């Protein structure tokens, strides 16, 4: 592997030198040539660290700290996200927070450049909605990854209903049995998982074909806007149909000829 890497790096350096000295013989503009040169230099600069990382994992069998890992030669703003899902214990990328209202409109979103814990995401989200945008929030529903005493206390101080799914099975059973509306709220929240899938795969595209955190953040913003326009259009169409059906019901039947 190391011998192959040295050969490939040698070819890259040769092409780099040729492009720098003989660019005038090509049909590339100065800007296009600099773009290619920058890409080659970027990869060559990371090769020693990439080889060391591969040696540690493949030959030495040793783990590499996340902060020292090269996840992509072309984008250094990705993170290792532990998911614990079957067949995908970890994922690579940026954590995305989405919050929707009961109509399915995304009212809050944030793409994180770092990798905060799930339980720490609720408080800043409530602050953005209530304090910054002056939106009245009566109740919130989240999965058990956000449940915790700190978040429960935060919601209680703000007078917001706590619909977080408890991590403890006994607490969950108690809420399902004794708290009015809790079961229905969790069922509605389950639909958010489908919303996330639609958002990622339809509106955001998967994989997201942009590099760099700022470009990904911008793409998410445009996707949220497009998604919400789509939802509003469907709501308007549904309301129009409801009114037409209502008018049809109250309209007197046509008289038939004897």
Predicted feature residues:
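Anion-binding and metal-coordination hotspots
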Residues: 1-258
């Amino acid at each position: 592997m190391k011998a192959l890497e040295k050969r490939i790096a040698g070819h890259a350096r040769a092409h780099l030198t040729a492009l720098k000295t003989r660019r005038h013989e090509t049909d590339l503009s100065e800007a296009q040539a600099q773009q290619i040169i920058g890409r080659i230099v970027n990869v060559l600069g990371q090769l020693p660290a990439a080889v060391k990382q591969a040696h540690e994992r493949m030959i030495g069998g040793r783990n590499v700290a996340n902060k020292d890992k090269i996840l992509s030669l072309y984008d250094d703003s990705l993170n290792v996200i532990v998911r614990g899902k079957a067949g995908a214990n970890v994922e690579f990328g940026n954590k995305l927070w989405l919050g929707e209202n009961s109509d399915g409109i995304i009212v809050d979103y944030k793409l994180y450049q770092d990798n905060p814990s799930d339980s720490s995401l609720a408080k800043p989200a409530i602050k953005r909605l209530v304090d910054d945008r002056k939106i009245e929030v009566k109740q919130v529903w989240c999965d058990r990854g956000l449940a915790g005493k700190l978040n429960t206390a935060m919601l209680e101080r703000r007078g917001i209903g706590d619909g977080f799914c408890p991590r403890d099975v006994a607490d969950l059973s108690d809420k399902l049995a004794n708290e009015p509306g809790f079961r229905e709220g969790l069922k509605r929240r389950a639909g958010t998982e489908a919303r996330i899938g639609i958002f990622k795969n339809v509106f955001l595209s998967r994989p997201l074909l942009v590099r760099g955190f700022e470009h990904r953040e911008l793409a998410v913003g445009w996707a949220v806007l497009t998604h919400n326009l789509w939802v509003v259009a469907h709501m308007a169409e549904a309301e129009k149909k409801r009114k037409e059906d209502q008018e049809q019901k109250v309209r007197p039947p046509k008289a038939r000829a004897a």
